[in-house]
């Protein structure tokens, strides 16, 4: 096992995360600060639906999936099982496509996604993305809430054995409102 150390990280502070960054785009610029949000499973705003099948291992996997998925390109679904990344579908135009791609990556790499945990970096705009993951046997699925169809996604989630955890989009989505 090899471990790389980045000595520049030793001088970082929380002030660094609050530093404003500017980036030019055609016709203007983007203004953005760092994203200091860290998922806390004890957060009172965390909504747990159908959490009966969720294990401590699933919740540990969720923390890893969050760390990977929240720092990946937008429109990501990340799969973790037994503390190991098994699928990371990034930059997809549709959440359901990201779900299918993450499962395909896991399968083509020789991993069984049954019992795994999924992190979605935003809400499911339709139930189909959740259903794809639940039908693959995932034990825990996390997504933000904030879609106009959240109720339909919750109804779909209630039909499956997978746990479904959500936090408001404005709380846990680093690029909320982009």
Predicted segments, located by residue:
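ATP-dependent carboxylate/acyl-activation modules
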Residues: 1-178
């Amino acid at each position: 096992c090899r471990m790389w150390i980045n000595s520049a990280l030793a001088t970082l502070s929380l002030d660094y995360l609050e530093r404003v960054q500017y980036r030019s785009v055609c016709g203007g610029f983007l203004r953005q600060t760092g994203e200091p949000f860290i998922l806390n499973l004890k957060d009172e705003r965390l909504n747990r639906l159908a959490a009966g099948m969720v294990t401590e291992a699933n919740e540990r996997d969720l923390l890893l999936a969050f760390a990977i998925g929240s720092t990946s390109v937008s429109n990501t679904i990340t799969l973790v099982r037994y503390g190991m990344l098994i699928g990371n579908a990034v930059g997809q135009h549709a959440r359901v496509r990201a779900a299918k791609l993450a499962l395909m990556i896991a399968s083509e790499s020789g991993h069984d996604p049954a019992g795994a945990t999924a992190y979605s970096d935003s809400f499911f705009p339709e139930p189909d993305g959740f259903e794809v993951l639940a039908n693959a046997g995932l034990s825990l699925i996390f997504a933000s809430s904030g879609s106009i169809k959240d109720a339909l996604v919750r109804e779909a989630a209630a039909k499956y054995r997978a746990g479904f955890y959500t936090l408001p989009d404005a709380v846990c989505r680093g690029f909320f409102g982009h």
